């Protein structure tokens, strides 16, 4: 994987986020991969990764692992990835951090301030 991010829930009362919470207000959608690697739009499979993608800039999208957790969400960007996918990774991370009131996230094992994530975009 090219990049891995972990966002911890900083709220006192922890509850998992719904996909509609995350994609609301953006041109993002989600789905899971079927047995043949095709995107099954709008479906959530708790046994596999969830894919978030930009409906206007299709690339590989962002994988959300452990998406049913109320404590931490694991985002992953796989190679090859488009520039749009890289930017979207950080936009999704910022959105989740905002919803969970998190000020820091882990980027490839390094603690980063959410307000200063732009320097992580290569």
Model regions and ranges:
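Acidic (Asp/Glu-rich) sequence patches and key acidic residues
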Residues: 1-122
């Amino acid at each position: 994987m090219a990049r891995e991010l972990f966002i911890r829930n900083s709220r006192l009362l922890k509850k998992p986020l719904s996909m509609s919470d995350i994609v609301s207000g953006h041109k993002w959608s989600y789905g899971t991969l079927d047995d043949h690697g095709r995107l099954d739009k709008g479906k959530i499979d708790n046994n596999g990764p969830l894919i978030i993608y930009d409906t206007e800039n299709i690339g590989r999208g962002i994988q959300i692992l452990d998406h049913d957790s109320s404590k931490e969400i694991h985002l992953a960007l796989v190679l090859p990835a488009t520039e749009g996918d890289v930017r979207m990774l950080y936009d999704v991370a910022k959105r989740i951090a905002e919803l969970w009131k998190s000020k820091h996230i882990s980027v490839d094992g390094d603690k980063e301030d959410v307000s200063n994530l732009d320097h992580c975009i290569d």
